[in-house]
Amino acid sequence: MQGRLSAWLVKHGLVHRSLGFDYQGIETLQIKPEDWHSIAVILYVYGYNYLRSQCAYDVAPGGLLASVYHLTRIEYGVDQPEEVCIKVFASRRNPRIPSVFWVWKSADFQERESYDMLGISYDNHPRLKRILMPESWIGWPLRKDYIAPNFYEIQDAH
């Protein structure tokens, strides 16, 4: 079943794949990494003015990495805002996705966390560096193929 946003994107010739609806009835779409930035700008202009959350996950060991965006269309006088979930999948070997920091500023720390935990590089992000792990940390802790080190060096905070 095609949702309202998917139908609008098809009408305007924008490439995507409908993934159906989640348990709350929120439409979920898949966008290719190379199309994501332009579609993000279009969605912002269309009215999706709030990035509620961005997260990422490892689909399967040795498989793709996914960056997930929950967007909300907030309008004055509308009691029930319209929501959509966008999934952008990236190759594990070279996980690169365009940053949407310049569209939704709230993507700043969220994209940095996804980079820090899974190694997804968000192109054109102004401060893409580790946010939770030390800069010297090797590897991406939330990847399913990550092997935890046997020894952690505790650094003196003083």
Swiss-Prot record:
It comes from Vitis vinifera (Grape). It is a peripheral membrane protein. Keywords: Chloroplast, Membrane, NAD, NADP, Plastid, Plastoquinone, Quinone, Thylakoid, Translocase, Transport. Its EC number is 7.1.1.-. NDH is composed of at least 16 different subunits, 5 of which are encoded in the nucleus. This is NAD(P)H-quinone oxidoreductase subunit J, chloroplastic. The keyword Chloroplast applies. One of its GO terms (cellular component) is chloroplast thylakoid membrane. NDH shuttles electrons from NAD(P)H:plastoquinone, via FMN and iron-sulfur (Fe-S) centers, to quinones in the photosynthetic chain and possibly in a chloroplast respiratory chain. The immediate electron acceptor for the enzyme in this species is believed to be plastoquinone. Couples the redox reaction to proton translocation, and thus conserves the redox energy in a proton gradient. GO terms for molecular function: NADH dehydrogenase (ubiquinone) activity; quinone binding. The keyword NAD applies. It is found in: Plastid, Chloroplast thylakoid membrane. It is an enzyme of class 7 (translocase). InterPro entries: NADH_DH_suC, NADH_quin_OxRdtase_su_C/D-like, NADH_UbQ_OxRdtase_30kDa_su, NADH_UbQ_OxRdtase_CS. It comes from the Eukaryota. Its main location: plastid. SUPFAM superfamilies: Nqo5-like. It catalyses: a plastoquinone + NADH + (n+1) H(+)(in) = a plastoquinol + NAD(+) + n H(+)(out); a plastoquinone + NADPH + (n+1) H(+)(in) = a plastoquinol + NADP(+) + n H(+)(out). Transmembrane segments: none annotated. HAMAP family: NDH1_NuoC (MF_01357). Belongs to the complex I 30 kDa subunit family. One of its GO terms (biological process) is photosynthesis, light reaction.
